[in-house]
Amino acid sequence: MSDIALTVSVLALVAVVGLWIGNIKVRGVGFGIGGVLFGGIIVGHFVDQAGMTLSGDMLHFIQEFGLILFVYTIGIQVGPGFFASLRVSGLRLNLFAVLIVIMGGLVTAILHKIFAIPLPVVLGIFSGAVTNTPALGAGQQILRDLGTPVDLVDQMGMSYAMAYPFGICGILLTMWLMRLIFRVNVEAEAQKHESSLANGHSLIQTMNIRVENPNLNNMAIQDVPILNSDKIICSRLKRDDTLMVPSPGTIIQAGDLLHLVGQSTDLHNAQLVIGKEVDTSLSTRGTDLRVERVVVTNEKVLGKRIRDLHFKERYDVVISRLNRAGVELVATSDASLQFGDILNLVGRPASIDAVANVVGNAQQKLQQVQMLPVFIGIGLGVLLGSIPLFVPGFPVALKLGLAGGPLIIALILGRIGSIGKLYWFMPPSANLALRELGIVLFLAVVGLKSGGNFVNTLTQGEGLSWIGYGIFITAIPLITVGLLARIFAKMNYLTLCGMLAGSMTDPPALAFANNLHATSGAAALSYATVYPLVMFLRIITPQLLAVIFWGIG
């Protein structure tokens, strides 16, 4: 059997064993995709015992390409919400998550200096303790750029594997500890979260208002400032028994019922100006109007603003909401359409069908992947990651590397959405498939390289002390920030659990947090809010630590 065939066969075996290990769960918690690392260690141990030789160049390529696929697809997935998560609504959550990352780096630095832990080993412990595989890849990349011998770089994977198990268990223990210390009633926390959402500014809501302000009688909608703003959409108007779709020139009269869409505060302000909120239904049932959701798939409208498409004027159709990457937004006139946007339309059936034809609404296109943008994005990411940044006092140029470059490019492209006929939307199923393939390939190679000496290191070497160092890196930041967030910020327990899971980019921890309350989305919401920024910082941190400690010795 050729070296290539043997290498591929061994990698396939690693994937099978590792994914099987990852599917083993104890009380609903398992290693997940991280099981591939341990599958690689097991297979690597027996490969070493058997004296088999695998293709080193091929393993290196597969490891790096797998990492590129993984971080690129993550960036494309979270790109649309990344910059939004940095705004005020998620600022507090992101600040606490960033504090966890910074504290983890500081604890790592202190351990490195006090116990003289070799740099590759301590970076591996850090990556495993925070259960972040891209951090491992970024650390190995910068160590190679610094000229670290290959055998020492491979130690990073071994120390990562030592620290990884408690990295997963540690966050679950922290959640349990917070619940015990503060005697948390999970059901009450879920109700508080729902109440805060109802009174907050983050959810798009609706309100039916009767026009009672005499100053508005016989005025056009476009002449009423509160109705002619990008904060409020008037999607339906009912006069007597007639329900209609209003246009900017529609004249409103006293007694008209308006169906408004917007954020809670804006709706309240509109109600103060217009009249009284009523419980009267403005449902389209039994009328010649209907509400329908259509998806943007036509390349000709990508990047165009809603106002430039003139849906109200041409088709008598109102876009009441816009859903982008799972986030409900007010469909402002300045909003530019992106591939995969879901529009909530109100109008007559024939008019809605006409608008659907304009925007595409081709569901099958959502399942297709444009491969050209994928490779353009990967190529740009690799180029960006290879650009040297010369910093005075550092022995080598700082680079984003094969982990940071593709991630940043993917975040930007995911936010842009499309350029001309090229769109960077990727169907969730395709994104997940490429992401899982990438991380499986990466972890399989890391495990194989670590497996030969893993048992000896654990039983006869410093493996146990590495595990101890990892416990400090995992536990100190999580417990400290958890206490601060709960005591001083009065953070909701479910939100706190999601933030802790997101700060470690740990899906098994998110699954555990979600299972705390079956119907609450608090944990998932906070996880998604901090995940993009934390993932970026987790990739950058080991590179900064490596360059700093290499420079100061």
Swiss-Prot record:
Annotated Pfam families: Asp-Al_Ex, TrkA_C
Disulfide linkage: none
Keyword Transmembrane attributed: yes
Gene Ontology CC terms, in alphabetical order: plasma membrane
Record flagged with keyword Manganese: no
Ranges of residues in domain RCK C-terminal: 192-276, 279-361
Subcellular location(s) per record: Cell membrane
Any one GO biological process: potassium ion transport
One Gene Ontology term of the molecular function aspect: monoatomic cation transmembrane transporter activity
Membrane-traversing stretches: 4-24, 28-48, 65-85, 95-115, 158-178, 371-391, 403-425, 437-457, 464-484, 533-553
Membrane topology listed for this record: Multi-pass membrane protein
Top-level taxon of the source organism: Bacteria
InterPro entries hit by this protein: AAE_transporter, RCK_C, RCK_C_sf, Transpt_YidE_put, YidE_YbjL
UniProt keyword list: Cell membrane, Membrane, Repeat, Transmembrane, Transmembrane helix, Transport
Similarity comment text for this entry: Belongs to the AAE transporter (TC 2.A.81) family. YidE subfamily.
HAMAP family listed in its UniProt record: YidE
Protein name: Putative transport protein YidE
Organism: Salmonella arizonae (strain ATCC BAA-731 / CDC346-86 / RSK2980)
